[in-house]
Amino acid sequence: MSELKEIYAIEWMGPFDSIDEIKERNGSEDCFIYLITGRLYHKGPLGIRYVGISKRFVGNRLKDKDHRQKQSQLLNKQFWTGRFSVSTYNNLDTKARRNRAERVETLLVRYLTNKSDIKMINDKKVYSDPCRPIGIVNRWQKKFIEEGRYNKPSILSEIPDTLLYVDKEFFAGDKMKLRLYTPE
């Protein structure tokens, strides 16, 4: 078994109904990864349709012409922004930091596209596996409350709370409730 040396915690914020809402959220300027959920035009249920990263502010990336064309395929769009829990990783100015973000994006895109019931509008990274073992832990924050955490919303149920890729296999798990028993 390969050695797993990369494990990252991603703090997700959302859902945002518009790009302007993203700008209002304190801390969103540190976000580098984003999800778009919605329904493909006249097809299927609501779900995750796009995973991307951006060196720039996510709101600006979502306004780009090529991105707006992809988003036009979706109805009932909502946006989720994410950042590494280690703040120095969120700056994608160096090649090493950009590569780290690319590996996280690839892990999420490949995991989601391998599930037969998910139809993504991503056209990149759908065929290449992560280049080395990697793991992420997803943590969910409320839209406008810095300290507020909550359980993963049902629309994001396809993303596990913990996702690992080791030896060409995906391992996934969700949060478990555990109540410690103390005998009296």
Positions of PLM-derived features:
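Boundary/linker segments flanking structured domains
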Residues: 1-49, 55-184
